[in-house]
Amino acid sequence: MRIRTGSCLCGAVAYRVEGEPLRVGLCHCADCRKSSGSAFVFFAVWPRRAFSHSGEIATFAGRSFCPACGGRLFCLQQETTEIRLGSLDDPPSDLAPDYEVWIKRREPWLHPLPGAGQYAEDAD
């Protein structure tokens, strides 16, 4: 079984996740843009039971981060964990987005990803 590890910038918070993600996506919503400081967030969703972390985390608006360096890492939900893929220790070059959400807010210079589902808002 594949194990992926990740951490914040300062290393105070680390995590590991086992297996393959349920789905991989890009989000262009205003909240993701503001919390990341970028035009979109590249993320993947795993079952909650496949995820574990160490170190103290802080959470704001459902998004967990390191209180020391501010690194945004994951969103813990009841059944799933959404991980920001830029926080992985090894680049996730084998993971490609299955879908894009909040494309009504996507920058006009960004083109739809071929083969990825396109959703004006959240995917249901």
Protein language model features and the residues they cover:
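A short Gly-Trp-Pro
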Residues: 1-124
